[in-house]
């Protein structure tokens, strides 16, 4: 399934039904009064969060969405039926923003949470509504109101508790695959991962914690280089970031600094999040050189640096213990 995490859509609620002009016509009632009923309310458009959805793909080719109009009133003061509401299911973690003002209209983070965006128009009044002592046979009626029109941006921000970040080819996908049941595409070249991969990691008590492998960030990601903004938004809701560094890269220290710079420039509190620094691929590097890198990273980050091998599954219990202690 294609992963779509942003969509702009136009929502048009239903028009209210018109009121009607009608008079009571019954045998033995030669001068029946007004009996025109009111129109029904137009349908509204309601967004509902659904835990079973992981993408906004449904909105890729369905950019204009309508609700049903209300029905006109009937004789004998019968009100018209309301128009049917349109229910749009979106993934949990979907933020809804007004395209024109940038104002956030809602944030759907809980399964079955709902948000009415476009409200249906009110039904018009039939002539029975206008009966008065001064006018015993009114012939006035009103049309139903137009429904609201909204142009909104849907933006999916994953609800993972732990985000795994780092430059391309640092070993993030291998890490999430050995920690969880996730099966991302893995290969020895940059940008193997083009969409976030999610995996549930089980604690000792059996409870699950959602991890997200965020596609490799690059220098300039905060300004949108590559797919930077698309990737960075998905770590905004995480509680902890695991920063994976390739220990056999040409310059692991510089790689660390690149990601730190991008987190700072993107803002939104990313740099203030709890972070665990991890050196990966320990099995491929000289032990003495590894110690030098660890010391430099710890001096630079002011944090303890963990050393692991995702491929050999070494150091993972210590990493998970650190994660559980911080959540």
UniProtKB/Swiss-Prot annotation:
EC main group: hydrolase
Residue intervals of the OBG-type G domain: 160-327
EC numbers on record: 3.6.5.-
Molecular function as annotated in GO: ATP binding; GTP binding; GTPase activity; magnesium ion binding
Sequence ranges assigned to domain Obg in this UniProt record: 1-159
Pfam family, one: MMR_HSR1
GO BP terms: ribosome biogenesis
PROSITE patterns: G_OBG (PS51710), OBG (PS51883)
Function: An essential GTPase which binds GTP, GDP and possibly (p)ppGpp with moderate affinity, with high nucleotide exchange rates and a fairly low GTP hydrolysis rate. Plays a role in control of the cell cycle, stress response, ribosome biogenesis and in those bacteria that undergo differentiation, in morphogenesis control.
PANTHER family per record: DEVELOPMENTALLY REGULATED GTP-BINDING PROTEIN-RELATED, MITOCHONDRIAL RIBOSOME-ASSOCIATED GTPASE 2
Annotated source species: Prochlorococcus marinus (strain MIT 9515)
Sequence similarity: Belongs to the TRAFAC class OBG-HflX-like GTPase superfamily. OBG GTPase family.
This protein's GO CC annotations: cytoplasm
Name under which the protein is recorded: GTPase Obg
Binding site for ATP: 166-173, 191-195, 213-216, 280-283, 309-311
């Amino acid at each position: 399934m294609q992963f779509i995490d942003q969509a702009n859509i136009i929502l048009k609620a239903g028009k209210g039904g018109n009121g009607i002009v009608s008079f009571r016509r019954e045998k033995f009632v030669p001068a029946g009064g007004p009996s025109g009923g009111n129109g029904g309310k137009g349908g509204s458009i309601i967004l509902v969060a659904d835990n079973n959805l992981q993408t906004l793909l449904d909105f890729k080719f369905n950019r204009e969405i309508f609700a049903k109009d209300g029905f006109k009133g009937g004789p004998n003061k019968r009100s018209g039926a309301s128009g049917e509401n349109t229910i749009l299911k979106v993934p949990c973690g979907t933020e809804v923003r007004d395209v024109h003002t940038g104002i956030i209209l809602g944030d759907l983070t809980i399964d079955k949470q709902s948000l009415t965006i476009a409200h249906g128009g009110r039904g018009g009044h039939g002539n029975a509504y206008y009966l008065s002592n001064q006018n015993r046979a009114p012939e006035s009626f009103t049309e139903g109101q137009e429904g609201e029109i909204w142009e909104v941006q849907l933006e999916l921000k994953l609800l993972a508790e732990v985000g795994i970040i780092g430059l391309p080819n640092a070993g993030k996908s291998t890490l999430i695959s050995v920690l969880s049941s996730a099966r991302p595409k893995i290969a020895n070249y940059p940008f193997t991962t083009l969409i976030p991969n999610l995996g549930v990691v089980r604690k000792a008590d059996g409870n699950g914690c959602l991890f997200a492998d965020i596609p490799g960030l690059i220098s300039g990601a905060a300004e949108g280089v590559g797919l930077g903004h698309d990737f960075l938004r998905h770590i905004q809701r995480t509680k902890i970031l695991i920063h994976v560094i390739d220990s056999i890269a040409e310059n692991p220290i510089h790689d660390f600094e690149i990601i730190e710079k991008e987190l700072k420039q993107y803002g939104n509190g990313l740099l203030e999040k709890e972070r665990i620094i991890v050196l990966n691929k320990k099995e491929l590097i000289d032990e003495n050189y590894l110690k030098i890198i660890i010391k430099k990273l710890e001096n630079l980050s002011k944090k303890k640096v963990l050393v692991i091998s995702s491929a050999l599954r070494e150091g993972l219990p210590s990493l998970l213990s650190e994660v559980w202690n911080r959540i």
